[in-house]
Amino acid sequence: MEFEYQSTIVHQGVLFYVADGGDRAYFVHGGCIVSVHRRSREIGKFGLTLRGNAPGNRVVANYVRTELARLGRAWAAPQGSDDVFVDALGLLLPLTELDLCGRAELDVYDPYLVECMVSLPASALSLTLVHDRQQDRVLELLAEPAIVHPSSGFVYAVNEACFALVQAYLSELPSSLQVLTEGLFDGIPGVRPPLSGETRPTAVVVKGGRAAPTLSVRPRRYAERALRATVVSDFVQVRYIPATRRIWATRGGSLSLQMLCDLVAGADAILRRAAGASDDASAAVVEAVSAVAADPFFGTGSTSLTGAQRFALYQFILARWHLPSCYAALEGMLDRLDERPGAGAGDDDDGGEGGGGGGHGGSRAASAVAHAVNRVLREATVFGEVMRMLVNAAVVHAPAIADPAGASPPTTKHAREDAATGLELAVMMSDAETNALDADACELVEAAGARVLDGLYAGRGLVAATAPVGRALRPTSAVCAEAALLTAFGDSPAALRGAQYLFQLFRARLTRANISIVLNKNR
């Protein structure tokens, strides 16, 4: 949902967003948006409500009600409704309703709630629920929260059954919040009301698949009083239907070496055409290539391919293991080129390893492409295995993985960011408990992982790239030897793990560029 505003004002220490010519004001409360009007008595509340851990149940909402009651805050859960707004999560912490004013993010530490929200165990979650797009003067209420780990920044997939977007009608604000609106509109210039006395409804732009349902929340002091069956609202939800940008799917098209060669040969032409096109799918591809391939990444130093060509390799690997990719979208763009380039890839000068899958043809171009995609998969696999080993070593004795002063050059920013992403997945894939590493140990693991990534991104080879951590992890040579046998055209558990690490780092780079992966379920 999007809410336009014209200006902002700070009143009673809370930031209000002024709309409708000064007649309406919004404020953020624990990730929800609350609306008050100068003349109308309606109070609108928009936000996510808590549901269950699977479609059709309300176990999460009921659990939060129980916890609020245990803390002596049963009054915070609405009466006569199955829905509990997400701002109630803030009241599970030592916060008051006033403390939640202005908060667009919430932290969750309850292990049961954490696992219900992301279907994985974790020590804590940070939920972002509202974005203030100041340049557009728009408050954006997210259809599902953006969930990350507060310390590592790892981005989680959201359990859709846990949340639902709802518009609520409140006959009054909670008593603790009523002080916020006293005298609010005295300091806001208003427009003259129409002579007819009628006011136009406020448009709320809905970008989701359907309108948010409405409900009425009865006053706390009238908990047993029946609600009106029908509510006439000051708001009208306006559906916004954009041109599709859903280029992501978990299924690729033709995952043959020949098609990959064609894509690599045409990648730069695809990108040039997409940059000049007006459709949203082309714009999404251009943004994704820029976000992922602008900085060094897997295959940067070990292949002579361009950023667009390496991007095609990443999509092949993700599609090959049924992870979200835009490989099928790239195939469609290749077919629409006016003149389809002949298959031909840049030569790979690394020369130390054979390319699996060479049975598809004896051409030099095909061999170079196979070699390049294998190198990307092998680098991602080695990074993942080394990170898992670092986590296990840090649990036993974290100082052992510290880099001796001056032994290695400073790591780059993109390597540190990618290593932080890899750490979270490594913890889940290792034998360590989720909370076994303290902050200092996590920092040591991330630093060691960044040193490995800088070596891989620079094309130093698997053995040389892992040398900085060899003192603490003596079996790295065995890991490198095993990875050197992997091929992107075969099947093995190690290759799958490498593809998963590639995807996590790939998705994190998109997230840092404010790009979301929304699957096209028609593919």
Curated annotation (Swiss-Prot):
It comes from the Viruses. Residues 353-362 have a biased composition (Gly residues). Keywords: Host cytoplasm, Host nucleus, Virion, Virion tegument. Residues 340-364 are annotated as: Disordered. Its main location: virion. It is found in: Virion tegument; Host cytoplasm; Host nucleus. GO terms for cellular component: host cell cytoplasm; host cell nucleus; viral tegument. May participate in DNA packaging/capsid maturation events. Promotes efficient incorporation of tegument proteins UL46, UL49, and US3 into virions. May also play a role in capsid transport to the trans-Golgi network (TGN). Belongs to the alphaherpesvirinae UL21 protein family. Interacts (via C-terminus) with UL16. This is Tegument protein UL21. The lineage of its organism: Viruses, Duplodnaviria, Heunggongvirae, Peploviricota, Herviviricetes. The gene is UL21.
